[in-house]
């Protein structure tokens, strides 16, 4: 299951530590750039998920937990979360949350090749709202 954690592409270990330790303010442009830097699969869909899950980056879970994706505490994979608050994982920074999502993808989604496969996985294993995929698709079509 964890065999693909090393598939996350970092320029170097030094860069990885700089990224994780940097405590800069959140902007949607910084999120887009960071998703690309981490080589996260299907970046426009992941960005749409973050926007949807965080209620356009305004939810309490995002503001207080730095949790962009509504992630629960990971129990069976590497994680950057620091614990649980409001029934969701909390992180030291929004960047830690994005790194955690990269770990999630590496652990569970590395074999998925197409957007269709990814959306199908989300529908069956991630979405709590019956219209989640429809909403993500709609948001992912917006320019970013």
Language-model features: locations:
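Catalytic cores of secreted/periplasmic lytic hydrolases that degrade extracellular macromolecules
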Residues: 1-144
């Amino acid at each position: 299951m964890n065999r693909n954690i090393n598939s996350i592409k970092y320029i170097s270990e030094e860069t990885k530590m700089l990224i994780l330790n940097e405590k800069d303010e959140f902007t949607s442009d910084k999120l887009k750039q960071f998703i690309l830097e981490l080589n996260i699969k299907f970046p426009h869909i992941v960005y749409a998920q973050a926007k949807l899950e965080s209620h356009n980056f305004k939810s309490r879970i995002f503001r207080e937990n730095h949790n962009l994706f509504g992630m629960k505490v990971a129990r069976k994979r590497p994680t950057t979360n620091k614990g649980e608050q409001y029934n969701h994982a909390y992180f030291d920074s929004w960047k830690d949350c994005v790194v955690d999502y990269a770990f999630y993808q590496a652990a569970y989604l590395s074999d998925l090749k197409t957007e269709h496969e990814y959306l199908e996985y989300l529908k069956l294993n991630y979405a709590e709202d019956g219209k989640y995929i429809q909403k993500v698709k709609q948001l992912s079509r917006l320019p970013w």
